[in-house]
Amino acid sequence: VPLMEQHRYLDLVKIILATRETIPLERPIHLFGCGHPMLFPMCIALGADLFDSAAYALFARDGRLLTPDGTVRIDELVEWPIASRTLHSHTPEEVRKMGKKERTDLLARFNLEITQAELARCRQAIRTGTLWALVEQRSHSSPELREAFLHITEVISKGSLSENIVGQRMIEASAPIRSGSVKWSEKADHRPHLIHARGLIDERWCPPPFDWTGKPMNNPKLLLISGGVPPWRDSVRGDVIRSLRRDPQCIPVILMKAGRLPFDLEDWSPLCHIQSVSFEPDMSSDLMDGALTEYLDVKGSSLEEASSDKDDDAIRTWLERSQISAKCSVLLGMERNKAWEWLEGMTVQRSSTGRIKNVFDADGVHVLSPRLNDGGLSLTTSGAIALHALDAGLPEVV
């Protein structure tokens, strides 16, 4: 296919995006003529399901070997660029001395082996939620592929989720929020599942309606927290409680490499699992425009102090209610005020480690359970009925 022979990968991306925008997600996309392993991760991430190509044989006929990072010629090799069952008993010199047909057959089997291996790698990456990390890695194989990748990051991060239909559909199709750590890199913040998570926070999160004393939130200030490590409920909660004791009208927000994370979403995957080296925090914030800020730098571990103070008990209860209501807002699409009202008088059941595993309403009915593996929420049947009775609308799938 001339498009790919000429390395016009940016045009290829635009074609797939245009196709994906119009074809229903349940319909498979068959990409004819795409047979280079280097392109598989990107095309699969964009929505391609099937590939049809004789590239493995055509490249072998010209003495070229396919690899996940590009193409190499047999004439240039002293060692094989990648291990394979097909070529392990031969040296490049021995293969060059073979007859045309024997050499072509051998290289074709090698190319087909590498092609199948890369497809298997992509399938496994989908299962583990690391496909976009693989796309980013492969994008460094050529300038043209890198250009195409950067265009993708611009498309999926443009505007809000509700306005960016193409980006939204790509995210919905390829990046469910899942547990597991994310290694930070230059373009990690453009991975769909991180864009999805930040987009939900930007569009749905707002401060709780009341502080822990029961007073309405009136121009609260941000408590920006830096220096802690996940899980933040262990490393910074003691500092958060002491700060709230001094000033109930503040909202704790964690400063991360990926941006700012409200403390009431501190255990929500994937944002709670980002791995990165230490960094200088960005003191700006778009969570609450114009809000006053207080900066709290946590040095090392900050374990919560043992205390029988009733205020501390009230703060802990408020933090739990704030966390559940924030997740109802961000994950279920509820208004924060309605979620807060719904949870009035809630009681909880804890795991052996002290984390909340079941939430009961004021009447003692089990309404939801926080998922300890990814920080999400699972509604019970009773909880879903109660949610519907609040006229909060149907929960959105995220």
Task: Give each language-model segment a name.
Residues 22-27, 318-325, 360-363:
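A structural motif corresponding to the C-terminal end of an alpha-helix
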Residues 1, 29, 51, 301-306, ...:
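Hydrophobic residues within beta-strands of alpha/beta enzymes
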Residues 49-55, 349-351, 367:
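Short hydrophobic/aromatic-enriched beta-strand-loop microsegments
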Residues 88-345, 383, 389, 395:
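C-terminal extensions of enzymes
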Residues 365-398:
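C-terminal capping/extension of enzyme domains
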